[in-house]
A protein has these predicted regions:
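Soluble, amphipathic alpha-helical scaffold/repeat regions
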Residues: 1-220
Length: 220
């Protein structure tokens, strides 16, 4: 069982002259820390480095009983990336509220990202009670992690844009690329693209007389 596996790891570490086979944490405590990490929150085992803008381990040699350090490290690396992406997108949303007076395309992108974060948080909170193993935690975060990673990818490019037109063009280009890479999220990403372009399209419609004039057009 798990204890026999742990004993074998200790024996092998001693035989190789290693000081430790890893510190064993309680399953429940460590699993909860992984869940918090995936959602972009610091915990007993993981913390956010504000200077580097990434999540890091508090201790490098923590594992759970029955699992070797190399095996658990692979999952931890994935979760560190998920948490870093989630924190980055959430910070962007908080810094660019949906009712901001800035660029309209940036505002609508922020609103779409906020809705996705809220939905994913609800899904993970609802399903986390059934995640009682490392494999289940990995499965729980696989698609949410990919989706938040896609948003972070779009965000990296959007932050370099200076106008609504540049933002819209960037989002559509990124969405087309990401939909080829992750076919399952196509409908979600296209919805994001539509949300980003909608204010600009309404402005164009008003400009050509297809709908009532907007305050923005009247001011001009």
């Amino acid at each position: 069982g798990a204890r026999g596996f742990d004993a074998a790891l200790v024996h092998r570490a001693v035989g190789r002259g290693s000081q430790s086979s890893g510190r064993i944490a309680r399953n429940g405590t460590f699993f909860q820390a992984l869940l918090q990490l995936g959602l972009g929150w610091s915990s007993l085992f993981f913390r956010f480095n504000g200077q580097k803008g990434v999540f890091e381990r508090v201790l490098d040699d923590v594992r759970v009983s029955g699992v070797s350090l190399p095996a658990i490290n692979s999952l931890i690396e994935e979760m560190l990336q998920y948490g870093t992406n989630m924190r980055r997108v959430r910070t962007f949303v908080n810094d660019n509220p949906a009712r901001s007076t800035g660029l309209s395309a940036l505002t609508t992108f922020s609103g779409a990202a906020a809705a996705i974060i809220y939905t994913l948080e609800k899904h993970i909170a609802r399903s986390s009670g059934h995640a009682v193993s490392l494999l289940q935690i990995k499965a729980l975060f696989q698609r949410p992690g990919e989706l938040i990673g896609a948003l972070a990818n779009i965000l990296s490019a959007v932050e370099l844009a200076a106008t609504d037109a540049e933002i819209i063009s960037t989002v559509f280009g990124k969405v087309a690329y990401l939909c080829q890479k992750f076919a399952w999220m196509e409908s979600v990403l296209y919805e994001v693209a539509v949300c980003v372009a909608k204010p600009w399209l309404k402005f164009v419609e008003a400009w050509v007389g297809l709908c009532p004039e907007t305050p923005m057009l009247i001011d001009q």
